[in-house]
Amino acid sequence: MLRNAFLIFLAVGSYGLLHSLTASHQAKQWVRQHLGEAAFRWYRLAYNVVFTLLLLPLLGLPAALPDRVLYVIHPPWVYVTTALQIAGLALAIDATLRTDLWAFLGLRPEKPAQEAHLVIRGAYRWVRHPMYSGSLLFIWLMPAMTLNTALFYAALTLYIIIGAYFEERKLLAEYGEAYRAYQQKVPMLIPRWPRKP
């Protein structure tokens, strides 16, 4: 188990570190300065393609290691968990559609920071990072869980929490007081129970 945990956390950590470093303002600035605007225009698309391809062997890692089943959720509870997974997917999809989807995919240039606006509609009214919240809800409610998948999801969860922390710093730098006020009103990942009027 310790060997599996080490390999899984190392793989996810390496992927996450590379993913975060290449998404940073510094990396983008380097590409812009050294490769020019024409190359930078396709940076986001290349980034998405490369990290999607790198994700495939990472997803296969838990299956490649010795494993054991922890639990399987049976009816009627599996209907509840599946409904919650669908809700998680809906949350993530809504969040994606509220942003500039084509720019997110890299098919249209991103707007400069000064032209971008803070999105606080839809799923963003409940949590500041609905894509992460929806993804976490989806993975942790899988109807079957093995030891390796639990370790993999734990590593992903840790990466998401750390990534959200650094993303918050970037958003504060971009949006200033508007984002600070948003932070005070809306939780990061777990929605608050609605308050009574």
Located regions from the model:
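Helix-coil boundary and interhelical linker segments in multi-pass alpha-helical membrane proteins
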Residues: 1-8, 59-81, 141-151
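Hydrophobic transmembrane alpha-helices
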Residues: 4-18, 113-197
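Membrane-helix interface linkers and caps
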Residues: 21-38, 63-72, 170
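Short, Lys/Arg-enriched, Gly/Pro-containing loop segments at transmembrane-helix junctions
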Residues: 29, 71, 101-109, 172-177
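Juxtamembrane helix-capping/reentrant segments at transmembrane boundaries
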Residues: 31-50, 74-77, 110-124
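A generic, lipid-embedded transmembrane alpha helix
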Residues: 46-62
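Membrane-interface loop-to-helix entry segments
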Residues: 47-49, 78-90, 121-135
